Design a protein with these regions (language model features):
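Alpha/beta-hydrolase superfamily serine-hydrolase fold, recognizing
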Residues: 1-148
Length: 148
């Protein structure tokens, strides 16, 4: 039994329609065109590659175990700590998942790190956001453990 999940910018919807529903304008109206283009390209053009790398079998794309955003009952999820990045092409999936967990009554703590992108955690010691996220995540995890 798992009572807490800690998620850093996860892919939460591999379904074949998912890249059509994410709006690049959600990243801000003042988003530099180059950044907007990269976000759009990652969300659309590379999605098939992402599915292949994570799932192997395209038949699993619509399985709720692979695509938790398709889940019918969010109450079965454990309390969740979610970290994502401002310019992450998966950010909107993360935010939708957080909303669904919250609506289902699941305790959830969400932090979006401004000014960074998918994979920022790999830059511990170089990006303040990576260092800050580790400290925040550990603190939140201990809070969750104390309340459990």
């Amino acid at each position: 039994y798992m009572n807490t999940q800690i998620l850093y910018y996860p892919a939460l919807d591999f379904s074949d329609h998912s890249y059509d529903v994410w709006d690049v304008d959600a990243y801000g109206k003042d988003l530099h065109p180059m950044v907007a283009g990269k976000v759009r390209a990652l969300a659309q053009k590379n999605f098939g590659t992402l599915c292949q790398a994570y799932l192997g079998d395209p038949a699993l794309m619509n399985d709720e175990l692979a695509s938790p955003l398709l889940c019918a009952d969010y109450q079965k999820f454990p309390q969740t700590i979610m970290m994502t990045a401002e310019f992450d092409f998966l950010r909107q999936q993360c935010e939708e998942f957080v909303q669904k967990l919250d609506k289902a009554g699941v305790k959830v703590d969400y932090t979006m790190f401004a000014g960074t992108f998918h994979g920022f955690l790999e830059r511990i010691g170089f990006f303040d956001q990576a260092d800050d996220s580790i400290h925040l995540m550990v603190g939140k995890w201990f809070e969750f453990l104390e309340e459990a």
